[in-house]
């Protein structure tokens, strides 16, 4: 568990803001990590969780390529599939909205939406559906999300570069679209390249009308 916390830490010492994580004190996290074995090998991957970590030079990128958890654990999950956060040294560059503070819970539905994350949003619609059911919400403490049902993700090394390729079908049922994302972090960590695509499932897709989309990149407030 401690190794996973280290895996999810950005250059400023804080955890990446995915699925209900908010801004926390790096000192508190450092205290927990102090109990880790100093000679333990760091996690190279965290495949069961769906999270991906790209580190080269002073650059760190952490991305979410997992499906939502089961309903009973999804009351704080966000619709941020294929979103990422990025730091250069100790400076945060791109960040997700994260969970709002306890005094700002009215913003929680918006914070959980796809538009609050560094990823593509189609037709101003989140890639996951918020399931509103009074009894279910009372039982698990909030409205869970459902979807995407399938997320594919690979992380490979090519001549020192790290290449992350992923896709999700969160927009397939509503719009017939699959979101593909490819990000390459150079061997030095000084350059990043990215490509986002929308395709049909298997056969060529002809849309009945134009669909707006936006690729969100949320800069950290200090940039």
Regions found by a protein language model. Name each.
Residues 1-95, 99:
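Carbohydrate-active enzyme catalytic cores, enriched for enzymes
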Residues 5, 119, 129, 217-223:
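Solvent-exposed beta-hairpin/edge-strand motifs
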Residues 46-48, 78-80, 114, 175-179, ...:
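Residues that act as N-cap/strand-start positions at coil-to-secondary-structure junctions
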Residues 56-58, 64-67, 86-88, 95-99, ...:
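Active-site proximal loops enriched in glycine and acidic residues that flank catalytic Cys/His/Asp
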Residues 79-150:
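Active-site rim segments in enzyme catalytic domains, especially the processed small/beta chain
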Residues 157-222:
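Acidic, contiguous internal or C-terminal segments within carbohydrate-active enzymes
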């Amino acid at each position: 568990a401690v190794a996973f916390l280290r895996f999810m830490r950005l250059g400023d010492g804080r955890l990446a803001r995915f699925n209900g994580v908010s801004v926390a004190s790096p000192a508190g996290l450092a205290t927990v990590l102090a109990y880790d074995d100093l000679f333990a090998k760091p996690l190279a991957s965290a495949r069961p969780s769906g999270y991906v970590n790209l580190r080269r030079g002073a650059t760190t990128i952490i991305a979410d390529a997992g499906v939502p958890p089961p309903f009973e654990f999804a009351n704080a999950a966000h619709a941020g599939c294929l979103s990422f956060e990025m730091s250069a040294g100790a400076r945060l560059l791109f960040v997700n909205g994260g969970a709002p503070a306890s005094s700002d819970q009215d913003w929680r539905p918006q914070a959980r939406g796809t538009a609050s994350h560094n990823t593509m949003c189609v037709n101003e619609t989140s890639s996951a559906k918020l399931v509103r059911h009074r009894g279910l919400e009372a039982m698990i403490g909030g409205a869970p999300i459902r979807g995407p049902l399938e997320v594919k993700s690979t992380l490979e090394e090519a001549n020192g570069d790290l290449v992350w390729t992923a896709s999700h079908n969160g927009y397939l049922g509503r719009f017939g679209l699959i979101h593909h994302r490819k990000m390459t972090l150079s061997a030095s960590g000084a350059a990043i390249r990215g490509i986002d695509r929308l395709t049909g499932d298997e056969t060529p897709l002809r849309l009945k009308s134009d669909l707006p989309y936006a690729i969100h990149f949320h800069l950290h407030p200090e940039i």
